[in-house]
């Protein structure tokens, strides 16, 4: 695995997501991030509790806890967009560059390294299948970031991708994402 990771080049993006298989060490994400420190790559971490907290010292570009995972880290219950902000800031203080917090029907919050906080309610639509919506949000955020290097654009693109995925039986189409993104932009004017 490490030999494959060594092939990453400047400008690449590495996603570390989910739980670690039992056949691997518990600190695998930390080991990977330590090894990648010298490379100019963006690392995204979407993991729970200790897996997430233990990599913060390596300054991942983006982490994406949901409000329940964030609350679990700090031993609190977080239900509103406003309530997650202080705890997202604590994760930034611990080393995360950007913290994207998904909140299902409540929408999402981005606490960005430019010290801006972006908040948006959930998109309007019928929930069909929430499986993979968080992963779609992360992928959409990074796609928006790579194309624009603008946090608001990346945030809205991520939210649109996650929402479109939740409103679809399988993965959303590009048109479904674009329709939701246009709806969100129209509402913010």
Stretch-by-stretch model annotation:
Residues 12-13, 98:
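Structural motif
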Residues 13-82:
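Conserved beta-alpha-beta core of the PfkB/ribokinase-like small-molecule kinase fold
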Residues 34-38, 53, 81-189:
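Conserved phosphate-binding/catalytic region of the ribokinase-like
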């Amino acid at each position: 695995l490490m030999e494959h990771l060594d092939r990453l080049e400047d400008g690449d993006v590495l996603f570390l997501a989910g739980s670690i298989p039992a056949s691997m060490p518990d600190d695998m994400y930390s080991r990977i991030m330590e090894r990648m420190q010298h490379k100019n790559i963006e690392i995204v971490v979407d993991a729970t509790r200790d897996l997430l907290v233990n990599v913060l010292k390596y300054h991942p570009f983006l982490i994406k806890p949901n409000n329940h995972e964030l609350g679990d880290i700090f031993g609190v219950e977080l239900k509103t967009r406003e309530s997650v902000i202080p705890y997202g800031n604590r994760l930034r203080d611990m080393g995360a560059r950007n913290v994207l917090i998904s909140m299902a029907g409540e929408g999402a919050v981005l606490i960005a390294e430019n010290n801006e906080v972006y908040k948006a309610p959930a998109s309007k639509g019928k929930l069909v299948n929430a499986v993979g919506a968080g992963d779609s949000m992360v992928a959409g955020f990074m796609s928006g970031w790579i194309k624009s290097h603008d946090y608001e654009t990346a945030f809205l693109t991520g939210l649109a991708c996650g929402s479109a995925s939740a409103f679809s039986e399988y993965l959303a189409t590009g048109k479904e994402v674009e329709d939701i993104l246009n709806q969100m932009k129209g509402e913010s004017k």
